[in-house]
């Protein structure tokens, strides 16, 4: 059975990808580190996966995450590229926008892309905050019409220091809300 897992960065994608393999599925993105149209295929947004993958007639699934938590998690790449002392800069909406628009690693552009840019009308959505227990197994098993079992797999760390994140300040959270308006409206209206 084929399906498309839309891997939105910083939403437990590596964990879920390992579980895909443990359930004897093969990933469409074997060339994960090769850039196509300036983006890693593993992190293709809707426009690119529809262009490069034959996915029109298969189920699409994704995992989303609270945009504030996702941004703070992704901020390890901002501190890596711009330095440790950038808290004041990211609290300025114009500076933050410039930093994201001019992010020096083009393949990483999708790390900060709104989650709604990855989602089509066909996409089945699971929220990271709901966990990966029996409810998740039932949800994905129903979509695939076959049993899917989650296993506890070790977290695959990046080569990046994942502890060097930005602080959650009121100003930064307001900037995040402005960056991801549609994510909040559609995916997280309760936040």
Per-segment meaning from a language model:
Residues 1-191:
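Membrane-interface amphipathic segments in extracytoplasmic regions
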